[in-house]
Amino acid sequence: MRLSSVMPRGYALFDLDHTILPFDTQALFCNYVLQQEGWRRIYLAWFLVSLPLAALKIFNLRMMKRVFASYLVGMKKETLERYVKEFLESDFDKALYPEVVAEVERHREEGRTLILNSASPDFYLAGISKKLGFDHHIGTEMTVEDTMPMLPRILGPNNKCEAKIVAMHERALISGEGEMLANTWAYSDSSADIPLLSIAENGVMIHPGNRLAEEGLKHGWRTMTPKRPYNGRWGGRWASVIQAMGFYRLK
């Protein structure tokens, strides 16, 4: 991959889940909503039924994202917007990795363009982007209706893997297709983001698993291991399960 010098200002590209905070933000926001309206746990009845369909690849990740979001069924748009605002100032704020937020602030001070690029539904990404001072944000485009339906619509692809790179090019946020971006840092915890890390001159892995760590070793990517409120990846998965049921309490 050729090194581009077209944009000397550079970029700082950040994944969200398990990168800026130690949780899946979809599950953490679900946890917050269920603690406000406990009756919404009824969504678990059909979500659990859908899991075998996902295992059999009858439902893809895009569809499962819609099924999971069914905990919002019947919610008014203004209520959802209020919950997002409250969530960002409470549970989300408590969960942030201070060390990674400091990296965001460093890149801002050094003049790089900050891009939050996540597979999460975009209805809360605008607030996260504003809160943390990003210049741009990209997520999975989930439609917010005046009253939320059982299966919210997703416009476009699930913003994951190479789709993140395509989205940045389509929005003209980056240039030089096929080129490595000079003076640029990319941050992620996931091997799904190897494409994102690979286009940056500097890659930073957050608690990488084996596959990502092996790839990072080839490229000389840096590793960060901020303190997590659980032990290992299985601890993180268990936290997501508890959050999906609305019973997780942040310390």
Residue ranges with predicted function:
Residues 2-3, 7, 82, 89-115, ...:
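C-terminal cap/substrate-recognition subdomain and adjoining C-terminal extension
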Residues 64-98:
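Metal-dependent phosphoesterase signature
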Residues 44-49, 56-63, 238-251:
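Membrane-proximal basic amphipathic "stem/tether" segments
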Residues 2-59:
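Active-site neighborhood of HAD-like aspartate-dependent phosphohydrolases
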Residues 50-77, 137, 141-142:
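Short, compositionally biased "basic patch" segments
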Residues 24, 75, 163:
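Conserved active-site and cofactor/substrate-binding residues in soluble primary-metabolism enzymes
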Residues 15-16, 67, 137, 149:
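Residue-level signal for pocket-adjacent positions within structured domains
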